[in-house]
Amino acid sequence: MADEAYQCTIVGISGASASGKSLIANTLYRELRAQVGDHNIGIIPEDCYYKDQSDLSMEERYKTNYDHPSSMDHNLLFSHLQALKMGESIELPQYDYVAHTRKPEAIHFAPKRVIILEGILLLTDKRLRQEMDFSIFVDTPLDICLMRRIKRDVHERGRSLDSVIEQYHKTVRPMFLQFIEPSKQYADIIVPRGGKNRVAIDILKAKIGQFCE
């Protein structure tokens, strides 16, 4: 049953692919969770809301532009944020990076005092921006993002080097310039130098921690 008096603060963290936004989000979540407990803070990656492609062949899935807003089920994410703000639990989708589709099983996710939402396309959607109490854009040079993406996708996601570079030039960089970089204007806070900017992390931790009290 929804709790109309429930207070849930949504913090959005966006930026280019491999900009360090996930590192910042996970660092904030891990350190704040140690202070306030699991029941007060949670984290939701936008990647969980890539559209289900189980009806497509693997060849068709490879052709999907995963850096375009149309690849995301923002309708579902929006409805989930509304539910969480009402004190309702959700079933959080899980995405399989190897199969390029949504996993059959979801994870039960209970409402929290603070939810950190992180992803590349969050600030491109006006509805999502309106659900956020404040937002952050991680501003990292694209050449650094590319090197990080190669390391991540080859070693952690089983991709070939050629496929990562081809995707970068074909969709990642063009979509960043068309959608993600322009969305920086909507951020309340700009963080340079990615996830290793400890000063920024400490400032954000103090700010977000206020909402957990």
UniProtKB/Swiss-Prot annotation:
One of its GO terms (biological process) is UMP salvage. Its EC number is 2.7.1.48. It comes from the Bacteria. GO terms for molecular function: ATP binding; cytidine kinase activity; uridine kinase activity. ATP binds at G15, A16, S17, A18, S19, G20, K21, S22. It catalyses: uridine + ATP = UMP + ADP + H(+); cytidine + ATP = CMP + ADP + H(+). Its main location: cytoplasm. Keywords: ATP-binding, Cytoplasm, Kinase, Nucleotide-binding, Transferase. Transmembrane segments: none annotated. The keyword tRNA-binding does not apply. GO terms for cellular component: cytoplasm. The keyword Transcription regulation does not apply. Pathway: Pyrimidine metabolism; CTP biosynthesis via salvage pathway; CTP from cytidine: step 1/3; Pyrimidine metabolism; UMP biosynthesis via salvage pathway; UMP from uridine: step 1/1. It is found in: Cytoplasm. It is an enzyme of class 2 (transferase). Belongs to the uridine kinase family. This is Uridine kinase. It comes from Photorhabdus laumondii subsp. laumondii (strain DSM 15139 / CIP 105565 / TT01).
